[in-house]
Amino acid sequence: MSLSQNAPKSKGIKREELKKQYEDVEDEEEIGSDDDLTRGKRRKTEKEKQKLEESELVEMKKLENLIFGSLYSPVTFGKEEEEDGSALFHVDRSAVRQIPDYEDDGDDDEELSDEENGQVVAIRKGEAAWEDEEEKQINVDIASVNRLRKLRKEENEGLISGSEYIARLRAHHAKLNPGTDWARPDSQIVDGESSDDDDTQDGGVDDILRTNEDLVVKSRGNKLCAGRLEYSKLVDANAADPSNGPINSVHFHQNAQLLLTAGLDRRLRFFQIDGKRNTKIQSIFLEDCPIRKAAFLPNGSQVIVSGRRKFFYSFDLEKAKFDKIGPLVGREEKSLEYFEVSQDSNTIAFVGNEGYILLVSTKTKELIGTLKMNGSVRSLAFSEDGKHLLSSGGDGQVYVWDLRTMKCLYKGVDEGSTCGTSLCSSLNGALFASGTDRGIVNIYKKSEFVGGKRKPIKTVDNLTSKIDFMKFNHDAQILAIVSTMNKNSVKLVHVPSLTVFSNWPPPNSTMHYPRCLDFSPGSGFMAMGNAAGKVLLYKLHHYQNA
């Protein structure tokens, strides 16, 4: 009885347990479905977020490419064959024209293409894609750092904003690296467009690249440095035909390529000077006149040749004709060996006897006047305009003559001189130098000397023997002093500082006994004749033009 009663009860219990398990399974399925839904939404959200980030990254790269330029751009060809999405190779786009945001290139719009997306984006030239607010909040002290002081616009300027600092850095970089016009065929440079007025006053910097001239050219206004002279020894000027006797004269033609040499071997030689071959052009033999002096007229039309004779020669370069002139009417001079020619090429002044100075016209070759000193005449020098003549001699005084009135304007004692032996005047007429028989050279300002001030601005006493020859170069920055009595007796004076060049004469070199010296019209060459019959040639590096 008990067994039958327990059986239905156990069945009911099992039924309830099965029902409960079924409900639990349904609950778990519902919970599982909810979890799947949540996971799906989360996954979808993450994908959308990832796409948004990728889109933002693409936009940022696009802006960076537009503003700063792309160093490379991946190629789309072949991407369908790649599984990892990486580019097979890159194309260099660095040569694409870039326009910095600080340049003002006009108001025209420019279209730049994005090769990855195939989009065309129009941007406005000169406008920044974005502005960094932090730049305005930062201050930079450009006065405290040495390398940043060049960015100052005013001397007392110190703190500037970050944006201003960046703008000045960019402007300074653009100034140092202006670029080239030929590399950008679509660019047009207009005068006055640059913010730096100094760079556009003499033309655009790109004009330099259109020529084959030297980029660094020394202007005529450059000052020669004192101390050491930069020079090079070249092939002897008369190496093609050396003289058999002492060289008494060397003189450059006004075109700077033609040099004459003359000496006691009675030959007048012409050389074309290039510093390498120095080709001989012509040699003329004067049978009856050992040459003491020869010189071109400043206009280059004639050569005046003289010796220890009563006559002199005139050689016409165009006609290649020699004329023998003299003796001069009314004069009894036995020698016309020393003379000077005026800068206007109109007058020749000869040293005469007993203190007389003989003035001869270069056109008629006739005597046009005489001047008389108290002592003997030893040296002469014309002023720059040919209107005045300086003379010195045995009485130790310097005379200044007016050739228009044939009268002496002023005479003064040459300080420390008992006998003047050499005179020379600068081409600008501001200075003249007087040499003596004791090796003393006094340099005067002509205006002060004529005004009564007899004190020289400099006395050079580096030589101990008689001064035979002196010469200013074309810009009066160098004064050459020559004494023929001793070997290597040549000094070069730096006139602006009134000091002697320490490296001249050249060490360990033999100049023999120097006799004469001349500078080319642009002072690029210096020629010096010696008693051995050679004409030494030097290149002065400071002067670019011969």
Curated annotation (Swiss-Prot):
A GO cellular component entry from the record: nucleolus
Compartments (UniProt record): Nucleus, Nucleolus
Main location per the UniProt record: nucleus
Biased composition (Basic and acidic residues): 13-23, 45-55
Name of one Pfam family that matches: WD40
Source domain of life: Eukaryota
Gene3D superfamilies: YVTN repeat-like/Quinoprotein amine dehydrogenase
Modified residues (Phosphoserine): S33
Short motif (DWD box): ranges: 389-404
Keyword Nucleus among UniProt keywords: yes
Stretches the record annotates as Disordered: 1-55, 94-118, 177-205
Keyword Repeat: yes
Ranges of Acidic residues composition bias in the record: 24-35, 101-117, 193-205
One GO term (biological process): rRNA processing
Record's comment describing the protein's domains: The DWD box is required for interaction with DDB1A.
Function of the molecule: Involved in nucleolar processing of pre-18S ribosomal RNA.
Name the UniProt record assigns to this protein: U3 small nucleolar RNA-associated protein 18 homolog
Organism placement in taxonomy: Eukaryota, Viridiplantae, Streptophyta, Embryophyta, Tracheophyta
